[in-house]
């Protein structure tokens, strides 16, 4: 019985490590696909955070939050000015996180 218990724990650890690796790979792909194109440092920071929240720190991330972070990744890569990055962030927030949606 002890062997089966340890075998189960080991299998769970191996499975969780594989999932974490997939998330890390998706995070890296996200950074390469979006943040690496940024010309504005604040937009790059917002996109890096969005990638992190979607693929690394996504425990209990709501669908509204997922949609918000994806909105940032969809619209921030071409931003060249901080003021526009802030406008995109506010618009994504209003569209996806508003209490009225």
Feature locations, PLM:
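Bacterial N-terminal signal peptides that target proteins for export
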Residues: 1-7
